[in-house]
Amino acid sequence: MFVGSKNALAASAGASAYCTAKAAEIHLARCLALEGAPLGIRVNVVNPDAVIRGSRIWSGSWREERAAANKIDTGDIEEFYRKRSLLQRSVFPEDVAEAIYFFASEAAGKSTGNILNVDAGNAVAFTR
């Protein structure tokens, strides 16, 4: 199981290293799915959009960098990410955990090499 990011599928200004690393993570998961399938090993990716609550990444300079890149105040970060989603909802740690649980469960026993976006509908991250 890999936890990627919306940025694995959609670029963000000022985050090229992060976006590249997350895109590479998806491709690694695909390669491992191919290699592991004969052994019954499943490999999937959960791609969340910004998980603000409970994430330490937002306590450092990342918050300021993302606010500056999006031309908003740092206090408006969570609202900005919520409003840019089609469903107008925030993504929480438990949402990501539930997606991981699904892929780890027998309910997804016939799934490998897949990506599940947990982003409340971020259109730029739609797979094409």
Role assignments for model-derived ranges:
Residues 36-38, 51, 104:
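A short hydrophobic alpha-helix cap/turn motif
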Residues 5:
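Residue(s) in the substrate-gating loop at a strand-loop-helix junction
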Residues 10-16, 38, 88, 106:
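Active-site loop immediately N-terminal to the catalytic Tyr-X3-Lys motif
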Residues 100-101, 112-128:
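Short C-terminal tail/terminal secondary-structure segment
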Residues 72-74, 85-96:
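A conserved structural motif in NAD(P)-dependent oxidoreductases
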Residues 37, 42, 111-113:
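Short, small/polar-rich loop/turn modules that mediate ligand/substrate recognition or access, typified
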Residues 51-84, 127-128:
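A glycine/serine/threonine-rich, flexible loop-to-helix segment
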Residues 21, 29:
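Active-site helix of classical SDR
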